[in-house]
């Protein structure tokens, strides 16, 4: 039995998904919240937020992610980074999932992936959980109700948490699986309730399709000057580097916080919402994100709360440190209504250096920018993972290796071409440690980071004196009004300069060892910019 609004020629039955129980098409937020609460999927929290738990899976399962290996993608997928699945195994998985789904209730959302009407993808999300429908309705971009009458899905994502895969029969690693089939334009997700798999599977899809059209796909946040979309900036960065925090600048308009494209026309958000970390969130540090946790239909995921008062505990990580909330962009007061901006004038690459070596900001040449983009460096510190007792380097190419189906140099060359042809200024910003490594030094003051970023974005930083860093070769400002000059020379902040030199040498060697894998694929300029 069908409910809701849908193109009558594009029902699930028309797609060969038959025998289901109730199918709810394109329910709006109040109806999805109502259904989720009625079905016992979670609770209504303060202000009407939806409080839920994702069970055993509180994060993504990257080792259970597959791409179906067919002749059409054989030569374009980065197989060293993307596990292959046989087409026959996929077909068995698909058939078994459809059989499992019969008689059950499902929720369908027809949505746009991408703010640019010329480049967006029409995506259908089929979810077993009502709150997953609510989540993806926040995360992607919602058509007008009248547009649903003619909506034709190009891609379909089926998410069935109650289905357990069989590794022997389905060609996967465990009973959890996320697999993309580019020939059938179909994504299957099984045995995980973690909502992030929904959005990241679509992101992976766009990261394959758009570069084939000459569009750079980016794991980054983006903003632009208020009233001037041509003064845009993008912020690349891995988890914990400050991507969301630093792009949420009250003096600038937020385009988006996580996934963007860079076309011949400029930047555009892939999404229509935000998926923010909430652990240790405070109203003082991030008031707007904090406020969303008590707004109607915000999805609050894996947060501990008082059973009587429903008050959230932002510091409790007993379920997971990866507590999150998902909400529409319009819940942020200075968010862009269009999700589009001009070409970035500034490209910022964020890193959290727990070795205490990198300066708080450095200016990069286009070749150096490609080097650091391909490197994708940040660091894990003690306590973030079991067994980590000292800083460990993390190199995640393109600042998002798990979501990159193509080889890294494809994205690197696209970025280098756009930076060079459009004259963007590139910066490396370290939000990590200074005055020593983690455990000895201190965290880079957020006030100093914001001051340096503001000066970079408004152009005033270009007017100060720069020095060439002897270890990395990039340019570092020697002073900026309002910023302690000693911070700009990391070596001077260490009690023992010789210890700094030894640590810097160690980090340079780590960069060089990691980058060796890309040397056969890069041009002479990038080779010359390589360190070590």
Curated annotation (Swiss-Prot):
Cofactor(s), by name: Mn(2+)
Name of a matching Pfam family: PEPCK_ATP
Enzyme superclass (EC): lyase
SUPFAM superfamilies (alphabetical): PEP carboxykinase N-terminal domain, PEP carboxykinase-like
Domain of life of the organism encoding this protein: Bacteria
Cell division in keyword set: no
Coiled coil: none
Annotated positions binding ATP: 200, 219, 237-245, 286, 324, 449
Binding site for Mn(2+): 200, 219, 258
One annotated Gene Ontology cellular component of this protein: cytosol
Pathway(s): Carbohydrate biosynthesis; gluconeogenesis
Biological process annotations from GO: gluconeogenesis
EC number: 4.1.1.49
Gene Ontology molecular function, alphabetical: ATP binding; metal ion binding; phosphoenolpyruvate carboxykinase (ATP) activity
Binding residues annotated for substrate, in chain numbering: 60, 194, 200, 324
Keyword field: ATP-binding, Cytoplasm, Decarboxylase, Gluconeogenesis, Lyase, Manganese, Metal-binding, Nucleotide-binding
Function: Involved in the gluconeogenesis. Catalyzes the conversion of oxaloacetate (OAA) to phosphoenolpyruvate (PEP) through direct phosphoryl transfer between the nucleoside triphosphate and OAA.
Family recorded in the similarity comment: Belongs to the phosphoenolpyruvate carboxykinase (ATP) family.
Protein's name in the database: Phosphoenolpyruvate carboxykinase (ATP)
Annotated source species: Cereibacter sphaeroides (strain ATCC 17025 / ATH 2.4.3)
Taxonomic lineage: Bacteria, Pseudomonadati, Pseudomonadota, Alphaproteobacteria, Rhodobacterales
Gene responsible for this protein: pckA
């Amino acid at each position: 039995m069908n409910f809701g609004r849908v193109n009558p020629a594009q029902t699930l039955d028309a797609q060969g998904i038959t025998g289901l129980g109730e199918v709810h098409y394109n329910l709006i937020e109040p109806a999805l919240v109502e259904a989720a609460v009625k079905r016992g999927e979670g609770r209504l929290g303060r202000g009407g937020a939806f409080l839920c738990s994702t069970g055993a899976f509180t994060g993504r399962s990257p080792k259970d992610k597959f791409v179906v290996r067919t002749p059409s993608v054989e030569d374009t997928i980065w197989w060293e980074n993307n596990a292959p699945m046989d087409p026959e195994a996929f077909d068995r998985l698909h058939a078994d999932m459809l059989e499992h789904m019969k008689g059950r209730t499902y929720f369908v959302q027809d949505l746009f992936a991408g703010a640019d009407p010329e480049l967006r993808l029409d995506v259908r999300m089929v979810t077993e959980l009502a709150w997953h429908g609510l989540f993806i309705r926040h995360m992607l971009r919602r058509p007008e109700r009248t547009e649903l009458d003619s909506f034709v899905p190009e891609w379909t994502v089926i998410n069935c948490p109650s289905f357990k895969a069989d590794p022997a029969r389905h060609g996967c690693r465990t009973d959890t699986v996320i697999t993309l089939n580019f020939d059938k334009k179909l994504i299957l997700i099984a045995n995980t309730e973690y909502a992030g798999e929904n959005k990241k599977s679509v992101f992976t899809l766009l990261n394959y399709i758009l570069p084939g059209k000459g569009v750079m796909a980016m794991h980054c946040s983006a903003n632009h000057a208020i009233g001037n979309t041509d003064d845009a900036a993008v912020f690349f960065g891995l988890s914990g580097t400050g991507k969301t925090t630093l792009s949420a600048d009250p003096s600038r308009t937020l385009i988006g916080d996580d996934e963007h494209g860079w076309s011949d026309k400029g930047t555009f958000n892939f999404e229509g919402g935000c998926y923010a970390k909430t652990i240790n969130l405070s109203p003082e540090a991030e008031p707007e994100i904090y406020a969303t946790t008590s707004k109607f239909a915000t999805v609050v995921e894996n947060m501990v709360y008082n059973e009587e008062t429903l008050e959230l505990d932002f510091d409790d990580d007993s379920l997971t440190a990866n507590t999150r909330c998902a909400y529409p962009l319009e819940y942020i007061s200075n968010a862009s209504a269009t999700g589009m901006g001009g070409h970035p004038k500034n490209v910022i690459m964020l890193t959290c250096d727990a070795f205490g070596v990198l300066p708080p900001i450095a200016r990069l040449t286009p070749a150096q920018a490609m080097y650091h983009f391909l490197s994708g460096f940040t660091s894990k510190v003690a306590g973030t993972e079991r067994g980590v007792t000292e800083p460990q380097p993390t190199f995640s190419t393109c600042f998002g290796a798990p979501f990159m189906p193509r080889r890294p140099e494809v994205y690197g060359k696209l970025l280098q071409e756009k930076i060079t042809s459009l004259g963007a200024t590139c910066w490396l910003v370290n939000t990590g440690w200074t005055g020593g490594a983690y455990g000895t030094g201190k965290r880079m003051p957020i006030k100093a980071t914001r001051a340096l970023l503001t000066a970079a974005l408004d152009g005033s930083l270009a007017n100060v004196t720069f020095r060439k860093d002897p270890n990395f070769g990039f340019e570092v400002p020697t002073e900026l009004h309002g910023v302690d000059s000693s911070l700009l020379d990391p070596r001077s902040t260490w009690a023992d300069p010789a210890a700094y030199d030894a640590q810097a040498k160690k980090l340079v060697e780590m960069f060089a060892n990691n980058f060796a894998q890309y040397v056969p694929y890069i041009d002479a300029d990038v080779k010359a910019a390589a360190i070590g």
